[in-house]
């Protein structure tokens, strides 16, 4: 039987697509601020620090949601955790669109951040647990495709709302319409998530083998449901032993856990350190500074999302064919080149006005698009795939929560720090907005060397054999547990 004949591809993609709606709301919720931040700045009278806080406060909620995700998904199950995220998204969208004070705006955006953090951890966790190993990269790639689709959708909606609108209307009502538009996908997610099955791995952890087998029989064909159930149960034996010995949460001397956690956290941090979310949050601000035209800047931002969507589709196709490590390395170098190109034309924008400024703005956009293309087919997809699959079952919930939290801590720092750098008088006079792009390009180079040194190839490795594969990059274990052996056993 061919690998494809072993499982029901359509069913796996269907339930993963439902889970990926959490990713769509993730992208929608985080990117909606890009078009609204100008009017919000005027409405609440914010300075550069206030703008940074308005944008980055969501990341604080994301950190809380990511840290809580392991406990919530472990106790309630992956399905109920996704439903909780959907409800929090809905509350945030309604509340942030109706507020009258900046304090309450922050509160409701923080609630949305908790939803994003929860969905960002649980959605890929669910997908990796219901997907056969040969489909895992493609299935989890749907998560990033959904994130980017949500971003493209809100970039387009923001542009259509702002097109032809007066500045006074945008300041008074426009930003509320932008934020409130999220209610529609929120309600859709609340509805459809109730129809997906619970993760078979979680059911096994709860002792509900019958429910796990029922789901596995819808995913796999022939004798494979029983075989996969046995693999899951075998992989949990060590964890059960540690529970009996009261070592479940004591990772202080667990070198394997800390090495894998180090790799997972660094992959998550480096994904953010490329500066991708500066493109998501502040592209209209950067482009408006360079062109002097807000409507043109919002229109250009749509193309950043479109290119990311195309790149994400390419990455989802290549991830299980080329492998994680080659794509991450190529993407890191290509992203650095795009950022250097962007920084060059930002530097050249000083003193330009009118049509010349708009023309130079399109050169800046070209650099952003080059960066986004390379980032999208590599780190946009690859970081999520790697973080969702490198943690073995015994440390899965805790490890993923730690890595996703690290991602959002770095997101917060960058989101808060960029407006301060971008408005800094000294940096503007000497670099005209190019300085942050140089920093991000340097981080891309660092990402290349980190992946080369610390990340083994995980393509085709089962979750049950992942720990041996990851430890093959350590000096002690590499000789004892070769990565080829781990793959051969898969």
Predicted regions and their residues:
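Alpha-helical transmembrane bundle of multi-pass membrane proteins
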Residues: 1-220, 239-490
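Short intracellular "coupling" helices and adjacent cytoplasmic loop segments at the cytosolic face
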Residues: 218-228
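TPR/TPR-like alpha-solenoid helical repeat scaffolds
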Residues: 227-239
């Amino acid at each position: 039987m061919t690998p494809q004949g072993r499982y029901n591809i359509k069913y796996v993609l269907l339930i993963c697509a439902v889970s990926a709606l959490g990713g769509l709301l993730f992208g929608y919720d985080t990117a909606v601020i890009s078009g609204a931040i100008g009017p919000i700045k005027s409405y609440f009278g914010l300075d550069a620090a206030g703008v940074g806080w308005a944008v980055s406060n969501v990341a604080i909620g994301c950190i809380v949601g990511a840290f809580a995700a392991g406990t919530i998904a472990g106790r309630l199950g992956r399905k109920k955790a996704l439903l909780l995220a959907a409800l929090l998204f809905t509350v945030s969208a309604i509340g942030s669109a109706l507020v009258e004070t900046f304090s309450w705006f922050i509160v409701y955006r923080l609630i949305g951040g908790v939803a994003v953090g929860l969905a960002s951890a649980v959605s890929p966790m669910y997908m990796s647990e219901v997907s056969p190993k040969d489909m895992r990269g493609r299935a989890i790639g749907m998560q990033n495709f959904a994130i980017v689709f949500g971003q493209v959708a809100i970039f387009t909606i923001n542009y259509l709302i702002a097109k032809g609108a007066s500045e006074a209307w945008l300041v008074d009502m426009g930003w509320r319409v932008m934020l409130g538009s999220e209610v529609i996908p929120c309600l859709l997610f609340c509805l459809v998530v109730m129809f997906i099955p619970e993760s078979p791995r979680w059911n096994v952890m709860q002792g509900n083998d019958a429910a796990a087998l029922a789901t596995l029989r819808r995913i796999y064909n022939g004798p494979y449901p029983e075989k996969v159930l046995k693999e899951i149960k075998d992989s949990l034996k060590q964890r059960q032993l540690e529970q009996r010995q009261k070592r479940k949460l004591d990772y202080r001397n667990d070198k394997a856990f800390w090495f894998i956690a180090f790799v997972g956290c660094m992959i998550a941090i480096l994904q953010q350190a490329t500066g991708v979310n500066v493109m998501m949050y502040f592209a209209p601000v950067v482009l408006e500074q360079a062109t002097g035209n807000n409507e043109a800047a919002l229109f250009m931002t749509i193309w950043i999302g479109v290119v990311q969507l195309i790149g994400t589709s390419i990455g989802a196709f290549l991830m299980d064919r080329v492998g994680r490590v080659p794509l991450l390395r190529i993407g890191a170098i290509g992203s650095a080149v795009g950022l250097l190109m962007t920084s060059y034309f930002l530097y050249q924008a000083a003193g330009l006005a009118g049509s010349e400024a708009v023309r130079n703005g399109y050169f800046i956009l070209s650099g952003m698009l080059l960066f986004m293309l390379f980032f999208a087919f590599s780190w946009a997809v690859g970081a999520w795939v790697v973080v969702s699959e490198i943690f073995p079952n015994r440390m899965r919930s805790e490890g993923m929560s730690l890595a996703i939290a690290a991602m959002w801590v770095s997101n917060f720092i960058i989101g808060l720090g960029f407006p301060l750098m971008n408005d800094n008088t000294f940096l503007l006079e000497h670099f005209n907005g190019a300085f942050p792009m140089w920093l991000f390009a340097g981080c891309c180079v660092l990402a290349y060397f980190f992946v080369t040194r610390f990340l083994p190839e995980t393509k085709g490795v089962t979750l049950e054999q992942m720990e041996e594969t990851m430890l093959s990059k350590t000096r002690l274990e590499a000789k004892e547990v070769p990565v080829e052996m781990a793959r051969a056993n898969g």
